[in-house]
Amino acid sequence: MQVLILLSLAFLASCVVAYSRRRPGGRGAGNLPPGPPRLPIIGNMLQLGQNPHKSLAHLAKTYGPLMSLKLGNQFVVVVSSPEMAREVLQRHGLVFSTPCAPIAVQILGHGEVSMNMLPATSPIWKKLRKIAREKLFSNQALHDTRAVRWERLRKLADYVGRCSGAMNVGEATFTTMSNLMFSTLFSVEITQYADSDSDSGVNKKFREHVNAITRYIGVPNIADFFPIFAPFDPQGLRRKLTYHFGSLLELVQSLIEQRLRARNAATYRKKDDFLEMLLDLSEGDEYDLSVNEIKHLCVDLIIAGSDTSAATTEWAMVELLLHPDKLAKLKAELKSVVGDKSIIEESDISKLPYLQATVKEVLRYHPAAPLLAPHLAEEETQLNGYIIPKNTKIFINDWTISRDPSIWKNPEMFEPERFLDNDIDFCGQHFELIPFGSGRRICPGLPLASRMLHCMVATLCHNFDWELEKGTESKQLQREDVFGLALQKKIPLRAIPIKV
């Protein structure tokens, strides 16, 4: 990819030299945060590497918690400390509340109606955010849908119990989360477990689309660094994402159309799912909600809900299998609280401090989004005495914060015990642990993700003993990751479940 960038720049350098040398802000560079030296035209692009979160963490050791870079024509500031993250997300939250979506995902009209891409000042964003907060992810809404989650956990336990050898843990958790999202939204299941005879057609295509979307969004795009190249789509990312994202939109559109036709029947009985509630809202006057907005909202929820929680659960199992003593502690706690029940109740979570500590430690050690969704400075402002020009892209490196030795004792070690004697949580107020973000742009699905992370880990650990597949015992091998929308394992976890 780097070769492609250099070749493209070589052919088109004459078009971008003047453009790339403009000052990053409207009133001049001023006292910018420190940063590494830059190459002409491309700036610091080559320093990102294949794992930008790790490359930026290394640079931050030299240039500090507020570091400036030039990525092509984009001026970027990287935040690498809890104090600076609080400044950006809380104290200056309105200035930095606009998301900075990659050009490749600004497709099919999604940017005009997506809760993930609209600025916080947008009336549509405010409307969708209110619906998500009050109707989808409120305590009452989640209480009303707890049976749906319990059933998905039961099916996960049943599938694992049928496995007679090594199984792909990440694939199983992805299937569980995908079916949970579709059941919650549409009262249907879209994927099957690996031993199903019907694992074909829509099932395989859905996995392909979600995996491709999360992978391609994480690929550095020359069109983001040099927007004048955007019409040419030099890496084909826009074309690929249009296909995969468009396919998910078509799938959701078909489910919505089926429901709309069914609702017109005289004998129709309402479904107890989110789509029914959203369509009811669209027919009322309070929200002025369109079917198109419902479609794009559902796709956003499916992508985010299917991938990140599944990946985090897989990482949890990796660390517990690499640390049998931690797994034994967790199993003992589950046995004492859950007893002979095979499926944990969500009400049990508050009685399981070691389970809670384990989930927190996984989110610290393997943050699902190592670089939180980038923000854009709506106006020139100051942070820590430095000028942040208007239109600066802000990255918050949660991976760096989570492994900072000045914050965490033994940060490179997996130790759930570190959370047993403090009240640190991941709900956005403790900036040393913000895997879901904070402030206006905090992940609206956090309450659902938290419930499922705890319950999936508990289900897998309470009902089964585990062994790593022979030849995969290396910690280095198991911890290799791939940067993307969610931080995925490079080599899927294959482990052998033993029914207890």
Curated annotation (Swiss-Prot):
Task: Cite the Pfam families for this sequence.
Answer: p450
**Matching InterPro entries:** Cyt_P450, Cyt_P450_CS, Cyt_P450_E_grp-I, Cyt_P450_sf
The alphabetized UniProt keywords are: Heme, Iron, Membrane, Metal-binding, Monooxygenase, Oxidoreductase, Transmembrane, Transmembrane helix
Task: Give the enzyme's EC designation.
Answer: 1.14.14.61, 1.14.14.-
Q: Hey, which pathway is this one from? A: Secondary metabolite biosynthesis; terpenoid biosynthesis
Instruction: State the compartments where it is located.
Output: Membrane
- Assign the protein's first listed, main location to one coarse class: membrane
For this UniProt entry, the molecular function terms from Gene Ontology, in alphabetical order, are: heme binding; iron ion binding; oxidoreductase activity, acting on paired donors, with incorporation or reduction of molecular oxygen, reduced flavin or flavoprotein as one donor, and incorporation of one atom of oxygen
Lipid bilayer topology: Single-pass membrane protein
Q: Which residues bind heme?
A: C443
What this protein needs as a cofactor is: heme
Which reaction(s) does its UniProt entry say it catalyses? 11-hydroxyferruginol + 3 reduced [NADPH--hemoprotein reductase] + 3 O2 = carnosate + 3 oxidized [NADPH--hemoprotein reductase] + 4 H2O + 4 H(+); miltiradiene + 2 reduced [NADPH--hemoprotein reductase] + 2 O2 = miltiradien-20-al + 2 oxidized [NADPH--hemoprotein reductase] + 3 H2O + 2 H(+); ferruginol + 3 reduced [NADPH--hemoprotein reductase] + 3 O2 = pisiferate + 3 oxidized [NADPH--hemoprotein reductase] + 4 H2O + 4 H(+)
GO CC annotations? membrane
Where are the membrane-spanning stretches? Answer: 4-24
* Gene Ontology biological process terms from the UniProt entry: terpenoid biosynthetic process
Q: In which tissues is it expressed?
A: Mostly expressed in young leaves, particularly in glandular trichomes.
What PANTHER family does the record point to? CYTOCHROME P450, FAMILY 76, SUBFAMILY C, POLYPEPTIDE 5-RELATED, GERANIOL 8-HYDROXYLASE-LIKE
As for what it does, the entry says:
Monooxygenase involved in the biosynthesis of carnosate, a potent antioxidant labdane-related diterpene natural product. Catalyzes the oxidation of 11-hydroxyferruginol to produce carnosate. Mediates the conversion of miltiradien into miltiradien-20-al. Also involved in the production of pisiferic acid and derivative products from ferruginol.
- In which family does this protein belong, per the annotation? Belongs to the cytochrome P450 family.
**Name by which UniProt lists this protein:** Carnosic acid synthase
Organism in which the protein naturally occurs: Salvia fruticosa (Greek sage)
